Amino acid sequence: MASASEQMPLQTRGIFRNLPTFSSDLKDLTAIVTGANGISGFHTMRVLLESPQRWKKVWGASRRPPPEEMMALLSDEQRARVEHVALDFLSKPEEIASKLEAKGVTGDYVFFYSYAQPRPKPGQGAWSNAQELADTNTALLKNFLGALDIASITPKRFLLQTGAKNYGTHLGPARTPYVESDPPVTLEPNFYYPQQNCLWKYCDEHSIGWNIICPAWIIGAVNNAAMNALHPLAVYAAVQAHKGEKLDYPGDFNAWMGVTEHSSAMLTGYLSEWAVLEEKCANHKFNASDTCPLPNNRLWPELARWYGCDGYGGPELDESKLNVIDPGDVPTPLGYGPPRKLRYSWTLTQWAQDPTNAKAWKEIMEKHKLLTHDPFSDIEAHFTFGDFAAWGPAFALSMNKARYFGWTGHVDTLESLHLAYTELSKIGMLPPPVAAANPLI
């Protein structure tokens, strides 16, 4: 089959630039998007729904439908082409299949974003329960694949999204930039690997193609803040501005200067659509990033400006005042060298435990009547990932492979993050920014 987009002109959609266009011969397709109310699933649905001739029907599968405030981000025409299917992928495949059949679900293409985050033991890290994560998330995919068989749904392509933990970024120093052909990191259970094995076995048995997409920190607007790591940064900025204080930085100098990657959920959705529609991309894994490296020394001043803080503060330079997370003498993904030590002066989780800040947020909620979300109601769930994003390790995803196959999409991460914060204000998660975005140019 000829390339779906290679000979076609590029397009711009808002802040998202150099996006592919596709032949008009691609039309009347159907898609199943799982994890439809999550940050990646919802934005991939938004991408598909932008093309009514190409995608006549999108089935959104999740335990609960996206709430009305999220659906309000769609046009009436888009909402008419999406239908929710209430599915619990931890139930038996037969039960899942019966609900698919009852709805008459069809899927030329499947985009799998379902994810479960079992709560770790008190005091443990977000990914400390590695085996439980592996068991739970592998079961999600395995049950769904079994249900597709029972319901006689055989897609042309099945896309699974994993992430940068594929490269062991959470376990210590790894070879950078992260490249799709890098070998698995087997220092502890990683649910991405058994998920991949399930997918490959299913696709081999059914003679269909697969794709795996690996994003970094994901940017987008959904009302589930648990995995939206940059949401608590805006909460912090809004509260500091409300109190008339500056936006202090909690990490050390290395975290301040380290250049890291982000992955806007919309751009990753465009890349995912491109990957499944391109025949040459079948059976390939692709990294997904904005191609806009962004260190905290450039993010923090903009974050302070967007919310009207009284300036910003840099990292603590007196190392005697820093806390150190020292993993001890443990092996690293790199296979040699010292383990990674993380240094910080304070955490967002500690900051959120100050009653003054919770009180300030209540006052902000009173001021902005559309603001309904209170992240201080469950501090551990809402702020833990924010600490990782604020002063965690920097890393880089190689986009060489996607470019080699013809991908050209780009977004400025500052513009994308500002857009996400603006949309989060529309769905009751944040107050709106008070200043416009400036691209990093």
Task: Put a short name on every predicted segment.
Residues 206, 220-236, 275-286:
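Glycine/proline-rich active-site loop of Rossmann-fold NAD(P)-dependent oxidoreductases
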Residues 31, 67-70, 74-139, 143:
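NAD(P)H-binding glycine-rich loop region in Rossmannoid oxidoreductase-like domains
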Residues 184-188, 216-230, 252-265, 292:
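Glycine-rich "substrate-gating" loop/helix at the edge of Rossmann-like oxidoreductase active sites
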Residues 12-54:
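N-terminal Rossmann NAD(P)H-binding glycine-rich loop of SDR-like oxidoreductase domains
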